[in-house]
Amino acid sequence: MKNRVFIFLLASSGLLASCNFLEVDKYFDEQLTLEKVFSSKTYTEQWLRNTYSYMNYVVDVSSREGTIENFADDLCFNDFGETSILGDAEEYGTFLTVAYDESYRQTTWTYCWQGINKACTFLQHIDSNVAYSDADRADLKAQARFVRAYYYWALLKKYGPIPLLPEEGPDYGLSYDELSIPRRPYWECADYIADEFAKAAVDLPLKRDGTNIARPTRGAALGYRAKVLLYAASPLMNGNNDSYAARLVDDQGNRLISAEYDERRWALAAAAALDVMDLNVYELVHSPVRTVSMGRKYPKTVKPFADGEFSTMNWPDGYADIDPFESYRSVFNGSESASTNSELLFTRGKNGNNGWDASEQYDKNFSIEKMVADLLPKSAQGRNRISMTQKQCDAYYMYDGKDVPGKDSEIGGGDGSVRPGIISDSEASDLSFAPALGEDASVRKGISKQYANREPRFYASVAYNGRVWGRGSEVYTESKPITYYQSWYYRNSDNGKKNGYEFPLTGIGFMKYVHPDDSQQGDASAIVAKVEPALRYADILLCYAEALNELQTSYTVPSYDGRKMHQLSRSQDELERGVHPVRIRAGLPDWPDAAYENRDLFREKLKRERQIEFVGECQRYYDLRRWKDAEKEYTKPIYGCNMNIPLSGSSETEKEKYRILFHTPVEVPNVPAVFVDKSYFWPFSKTELKRNKRLTQNPGWNIYD
């Protein structure tokens, strides 16, 4: 095997060094034996670099072209009437209705297996390279093991149970029939991947310096291990007796999803999350109180609700000394670099390129900057195409932790309250009213009261009708003395339903990744580079709380390295340990004791917390499936503002009527509310099924016998 000649693609632009090391720019082909590759430090590290490079195509945060799963029941994408760069006409609707075929979007499958094969080869041969010290060699092996486990995890999450290669990788001297291997049960896949992450964690460092920030650390390996085990404990994979699970079998007819519920799996997930927490390396990003306004881009801190508890204490026990709005938005908008973001367990560094152009290469579609270009308003030369559903908008709390009046009233939920009206002139002039909407009365007038007095994460994420955009990178001149931009979505307005498909379908925009300087207008415009939040500490904290909530007895579980034993049981103190940091950073009061005392109520609240905290991070798509909530949530009609309503009328009284009509939720046309159970897992392509004779198709998809 070692003397077999391989085509080794070598990067001509340096080694694995910087935070954007995943950009493999130019290659040349050279015939090299594996013996020669792994006797050279240069070639060895370039092999590892190439192993990493496939991560560029397996991202969680990007727009429609890169990660269409980022659009679940929380976000919508307007491409109706358009043919995408990928050649798919009106692709969003096709995705929603699961009208695609088995060849659709197989990028994850293709690149993950290439990465797995590369990692297997690296692990088989790195020990022969005597140019490294034992410590450096152990780190490199741990990196390769992490990357291989990551690719396996990406496949398992998307495709469900998968084949697992032998440790040494495939023997390419065998025929296709001899190489064919069956799918392994979900729990076996999860246990194997979790074990691989644990092995990697032992030899990975706690931290990396700034030049190696996108290489994995111990926390990254342990964090993904916790995610893997949490999914394995979830209802779709644990004790699932429905017809879908019964049809998901290997080539011998054996079930691939367990019909027997195992509570201990929740304990394993909780212990894995606790392994991360016990590192004492991570904490949620938090910004100090801003006592003086620095303009519309950086407003004075809006004091959170005085709950008598969190409001009286400083971070991390309370929010008296932090700015929750700035704390949350800086995680995503580029204000924090990969090296300063204290809650990032893993990132690929700067995901994508600064700016986006349709003529540029396809891989730039796998970037946050592409997403920002799609959600910026037309007035900033954005594409204005990403919107938030009314259901997602309603999920955000009021600043005091209560529900917004009228929440979910159109989809059979809520408490019978009605949605509030429009902010009047007198209310807009009252500086104590809805300060988070803007410090000047001029920008508060005419905004719906349903957007007033909401929690800080709302203002960091929601581009409601009348929202102010910073656009600070633009150059202002005497002929262009504009100091802010307020975007309205009324029909025929610049950012509303006017022409083509460049308007938000629901009339509720999304701006979680937008920096106050972001704009594509003018020569000096720019989109601030973003750091991909691939895995955050907030996720680990809520994973811990979710898993712990499901325990009905006590468990003793060893840590990842066997050096300590975790004693696990459901208790309010431990549940608060997972929930409190997220709620405090959000500037929200604690849940009532009843939520901690009642397992079902806690589960309901935790699901809502995840819905809010991780919107636009490709979590909702998978969360709804693993919880088996997808059918319930996807079949609720999608509501939003009435985009057919213009702001008409010659008097304020007449305009008021149109404002109310616009903000009265209606069902969004062309966005079907449907769930098809075959979309629990992605299909295998016809090519792959023919290549691997023992690979069985996921239920509901063509098997191509």
Label each PLM-derived region with a short phrase.
Residues 19-69, 292, 437, 449-452, ...:
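Membrane-proximal, proline-rich intrinsically disordered regions
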Residues 156-157, 163, 228-240, 550-554:
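Short coil/turn linking the two alpha-helices of tandem helical-hairpin repeats
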